[in-house]
Amino acid sequence: MSSIHDPRYKNLIKELIKIRELKNITQVELATSLKKPQSYIAKVENLDRRIDVIELHDWLSALDKSISDFLASCFEK
């Protein structure tokens, strides 16, 4: 099984989406703060593109969330 289809990875992406939506941040706004096109956000959220740890850190920083807290909450379930 490729890691993009791993249930843990899918949960991680669901949590990223949840945080973004709870903060009322659109894909366009997040992409702008990351200096990426909106399609980058859409591809990650639709599981068409894998996100690496540096990108995850930048993504969470843009959402004002700590990577350590985020990972702890994703994997404690």
Question: Positions of the model-derived regions?
Answer:
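A short, Lys/Arg-rich alpha-helix, primarily the initiator
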Residues: 1-22
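Residue-level signal for the short linker/turn that defines the boundary of a DNA-recognition helix
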Residues: 14, 24-25, 51-54
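Residue-level detection of the helix-turn-helix DNA-binding "recognition helix"
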Residues: 21, 35, 46-48, 75
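Short alpha-helical DNA-recognition segment
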Residues: 24-43
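DNA major-groove recognition helix of helix-turn-helix/homeodomain DNA-binding modules
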Residues: 54-69
